[in-house]
């Protein structure tokens, strides 16, 4: 407790000593006021001005960053929208090309079938024509053979014994 008593006495004595010399108190007050004015003029205003400029610069940068962020978001949205549109167009183009290719495939197959039918019909007509021609030749040959056989029979060159030989000879000649 002695320590506290000593501290208390020292503070009391210091306060009493301040007020014993008023001229020192006035000089102290004047020096403090001058110090405050000097600090206010030479330090406070420049520091405040610097801090305000720094605050404005930071605010401006934050505003620009927010603006850039909005711009980036807008560009991203536009690109995403454009990507979706292009993707949709590509899908439609693919579907259109696939359907056109399918139609072209069907057309080519149909044309090939029609061409095959036409060629088969042409071959059938050619075969029928050839059959008619060969039939006519065979008829003509039969007529000629029959006429020749009849001539030989009428001229008495053919007998019952050699008729088969004569017919075979004539067939060999005509064919």
Curated annotation (Swiss-Prot):
Belongs to the ATPase B chain family. Keywords: ATP synthesis, Cell membrane, CF(0), Hydrogen ion transport, Ion transport, Membrane, Transmembrane, Transmembrane helix, Transport. CDD domains: ATP-synt_Fo_b (cd06503). InterPro entries: ATP_synth_b/b'su_bac/chlpt (IPR002146), ATP_synthase_B_chain (IPR050059). It comes from Acholeplasma laidlawii (strain PG-8A). The chain crosses the membrane at residues 24-44. This is ATP synthase subunit b. It comes from the Bacteria. GO terms for cellular component: plasma membrane; proton-transporting ATP synthase complex. It is found in: Cell membrane. The keyword Chaperone does not apply. F(1)F(0) ATP synthase produces ATP from ADP in the presence of a proton or sodium gradient. F-type ATPases consist of two structural domains, F(1) containing the extramembraneous catalytic core and F(0) containing the membrane proton channel, linked together by a central stalk and a peripheral stalk. During catalysis, ATP synthesis in the catalytic domain of F(1) is coupled via a rotary mechanism of the central stalk subunits to proton translocation. Component of the F(0) channel, it forms part of the peripheral stalk, linking F(1) to F(0). F-type ATPases have 2 components, F(1) - the catalytic core - and F(0) - the membrane proton channel. F(1) has five subunits: alpha(3), beta(3), gamma(1), delta(1), epsilon(1). F(0) has three main subunits: a(1), b(2) and c(10-14). The alpha and beta chains form an alternating ring which encloses part of the gamma chain. F(1) is attached to F(0) by a central stalk formed by the gamma and epsilon chains, while a peripheral stalk is formed by the delta and b chains.
